[in-house]
Amino acid sequence: VCDSDAVYGTTTMEGLFSEPVPICGVLGDSHAALFGQGCLKPGMIKATYGTGSSLMMNIGDKPIQSSHGVVTSLAWGRGGKVDYVLEGNLNYTGAVITWLKDDLKLISSAKETEGLAREANPADRTYLVPAFTGLGAPYWDEKATASISGITRTTGKAEVVKAALDCIAYQITDLVRAMEQDTGMRIEELRVDGGPTRNGYLMQFQSDITNKRVNIPDAEELSGIGAAYMAGISAGVYDLEKLAGN
């Protein structure tokens, strides 16, 4: 077993490179995104929004066993030292928007959802539980089924779309609270990435209900950036302290 910044070997990519290139940054997908987001200290947390979502929190060099429905995992190893994370995965987040578009035919593109959510009646209390394939962390209920509640005669397309966006933020919030309870740490900022983070309504609602700053980077491929950072540190191109400061 090697550290994440170890030199694993070299490659020419089957002749693509004229000289062998060292392989010296190896990380899992979400773990690389955590590193790419600069979550290098205990208490720092990132959320990747995609078809499903992954939330990961750096907890430092001592593992913590969760009692609130998330799992403990390795973050990375550097110089013989291992950092750990709490991790929670959600089955249905961005996929809810696909359901609105492909199955319900309420929208023709994901971009429409922000405007519709802003048009929705703020007094409407429609809620969506997106348990189309059960519920993942922190609920772990494989038998749960999806439901929509609170519909009234005045509930329309905009209100249903808003409920779909809201349910993404509610699930992320439940994971944030679970991790705060497990660690006793107060999370100040949520660093986010993934396609749905371009939705201004969703990101503002996420910030409101978690009462956290939501930091949206300009870059989109945080996993690739994290792996590149790790390789660069191993090769002496990057300095970890400077990366952490930025």
Where are these regions (language model features)?
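Active-site-proximal segments of catalytic enzyme domains
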Residues: 6
